[in-house]
Amino acid sequence: MDPTDAFLDAVQAIYGPVSFTPLADGTIHRFHVHDDKPGSRNGWCVLHLDGIASGCFGSWKNGGIHRWASRQPANPLEAEQVRQRNEQAKQQREAELKKKQQEAAEKAQRLWRDASPADPDHPYLAAKSCRPHGLRQLSHALLVPLYREGQLVNLQHIFPDGTKRFLQGGRVSGCYSPLGTIKPGQPIYICEGWATGATLHEETGAAVACAMSARNLLPVGRYLLHHYPDAVLIIAGDDDRTKEGNPGRTAATKAAAALGCRLVLPQWPDDVPLELSDFNDLRKWREK
């Protein structure tokens, strides 16, 4: 089989059908990943055809690197060639990722500066029965800030219908949206979504770090544990009872175990609908 076709088969085995032909020039090229947002190009690949054909590919969105070679190296020289190419691809990927994140951070800071204080009657806030807590608003979208090392690095747009979108290329892993003030020896709740965090802050008065996703609970927890070693971390997990494997509970349980901290989950009365999954859902149900 032609090496380019074989490389493309390897890409499609991981990411599904793609509509591009890899260029074998040793530099990063981007492509659309099947089932990602239309028009996005989160996939990336690097291909070499000289010597032993080899390459790498992955997704900006999902992370990770997949390595491919047309055959096993025949000698130490070929093995070293493949190793150097993989290292070069890694460096290219990291440089491009850093560039994309910096561009997104600059855009986030510009949008945040130009936005106005959020309307307390915004449809999303009304639906969640939450106060704005310093959110800003641009046109019809709420802006939720994400911070890392005290710097604004990304924004989550929340539209009136509840649709959510981060800035393209913006950093999320290890970043969070804060509510309240972190104090030595006091609790910090780490949760998924902003509305859940706002609910926890309003109910407890404690500081909250909204990690934005289940898989980001642990990275945020590690960051907070390093920077606030005297704080009392509490993972406040979602309970995705209707989803296979209950990803919210599973991720929260693993994060709490890895951090050695307390885990809290919504305590459901017997008559609560199964589709409710987080602390905000529980509060809204109780208010009915």
Residue ranges and their predicted role:
Residues M1-A6, Q186, E202-K288:
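TOPRIM fold recognition
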Residues P123, P132-Q137, V153, I234:
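Phosphate-handling catalytic cores of nucleic-acid transaction enzymes
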Residues E103, H140-P229:
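Phosphate-handling DNA/RNA-contact segment within nucleic-acid enzymes
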Residues G16-F20, C130, C261:
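Short aromatic/hydrophobic-glycine micro-motifs
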